[in-house]
Each structure stands twice: as structure tokens, then as C-alpha cells.
Amino acid sequence: MNIAGVVILYHPDIQLLSENIITYVQGLKKLYVYDNSETKTPGIEEALSKLHPFIQYHYFNANEGIAKRLNRAVEEASKNHYDYLLTMDQDSSFKVGDFEKYTSQIQAAAYTNVAQFGVNCQPNFTIPKEQPEEALTLITSGSILNVSLIERVGVFNEDLFIDFVDAEFSYRVVQNGHINLMFSNIILNHALGKLIEGRSLANFKKTLRITHSPIRVYYIIRNGLYLLFKAKGLNAIMKKDVLRCIKILKNDLIYNPELVSVYKNLFSGIFAFLSNKKGEK
């Protein structure tokens, strides 16, 4: 399979990053490693060079968001004539043999109208099935882009900076008559947020809750409101999906240990939406 990959970093743990990259790098012809950290992690270039000779590390001395790095990777993949591009987060990995299984399934079916392939990042909620299914959205990590169709879909929206970048792109895939295809039998090891224990206000039982850093609250509410009220072409199903994602913040508003900062970022994000502020906070 003529495929490159990109993994986007932000203050990575070198050991964990290396362990994750090993699970998919052998199936790639090139891996672009784009570092969004404000300060460079000592020893990272040396560590990456030992993993695979086809790894290219780039440090930008600034965090300019995930969308800009994804667009750079798509541009590089197109310029170097790769057919597909794997997009990964630094904390994501595949089970042994799963990445090879993933790419083999894509090759075997010779899909022509699929702009984006994805995997199952929530096996507790999405039951694995042998046959792939169309999806409204796919997360960035673990997705494989059909480079030839990106021009029709359009590039990733750099105004969003971080959150909803993958969802907004997925919506445009559908709007342009293409398909997001999920292989739910391929499980991605991926953390969607920080898990903390919280007591239910309904039955007082303690359960694990997904929370986010306060700055993520800012981007989730700002970008979510943008998609709901200002983005063009979103149908009712897409807007319902955006609302579902925004509602995830309820755990942060109740259980996040940094409540003061969470609420500051919430109101700051709402104000940013009202004042049409885009990009980085």
C-alpha cells in the first residue's frame, strides 16, 4: 500500500511515543513527525532515528494547532505521490497485527469513493463488526485519508485550531458526496480525555468520568457553537452530533478538579464565538 503517515506531538513522553509508533511504522513508506511543542523535548530526534529510517522529524518552535500540521502532511503526501495518509495522535497505538489487517482490508476492497477510513476508538460503545460501515464522523487518530479526494473535500479548517477539526472535516466529506468508512473490528488504543471518579447527582454512585484540560473546554465550546450557528451546509443530523459533543462538557462543569479555570475558559470560549475570534486562544 502506497501510504505515508503523520503523528502530531505536544510535549511527548519519548518512551511512550516510541512504543506507540512501533505499532504502525513498519506498514508505512514515510512517517512525518510534526512537533507542536513550545520547547523541544531533549533526545527526541535521536530516539526517533533509531525506530525507523523513514521517519522525518520536524520541530516548529510553536503550537499552531492540529489542522495546520495535518494540512502540511497532506501537502507533503501529495507532493511525494503517496496515495494514502495515516493520521495519528502521539498517545494512540494499534494492537499487534491490527494495522496490517487494517490496510489489507482497505486494499482488498479497492474503495474509490471513500475519502476517509477510520477505526474503533470506543469498543465499549461501538460493537466491533466484521464488515465496515459508513460513519458520520471519524476521529483524526487512526484515520487513513485518500489523498486524491482531499482536493474535492477541502483542507482541514485551521480556524478551529484543535477541537472539532476532525468532525468538521468528516461533515464535509459527506457534504461532498464521499464516504467516511469505519472498520469497527480494528481497535485503536486511544485516550479521549482524562478519566476521574465522580459521584452521580442522580443515584450518588461513583463512576469514571471523562474530563478535559480547561483550555480544551475553551475550544470545544467556541468551535462547537461555530459549527452549530455559523458553519455552512450542516444538516440536522450533523448539528445533533455537534450538540452531543458539546454536552460532554457537563462532566467538566461538575467534576473537573480545576473548576474555576474550567468556567473561565467556558465563558471565554462563548465570548470568542460571539466576537468571531478564530484560531489560537
Question: Residue ranges of each PLM-predicted region?
Answer:
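Short, well-formed alpha-helical segments that are part of the catalytic scaffolds
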Residues: V7-G27
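Short beta-strand/loop segment that forms part of the nucleotide-sugar
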Residues: K29-T39, H58-F60
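A conserved acidic beta->alpha catalytic loop
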Residues: Y34-E45, S92
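Glycine-rich, basic loop-to-helix element that forms the pyrophosphate-binding segment
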Residues: F60-A77
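Short beta-strand-to-loop acidic/aromatic patch adjacent to the donor-nucleotide binding site
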Residues: Y82-D91
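Conserved donor NDP-sugar-binding/catalytic core segment of glycosyltransferases
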Residues: K95-K129
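A short, conserved alpha-helix in the catalytic core of glycosyltransferases
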Residues: L149, D159-L192
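Non-catalytic, C-terminal membrane-associated alpha-helical segments of glycosyltransferases
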Residues: L228-K281
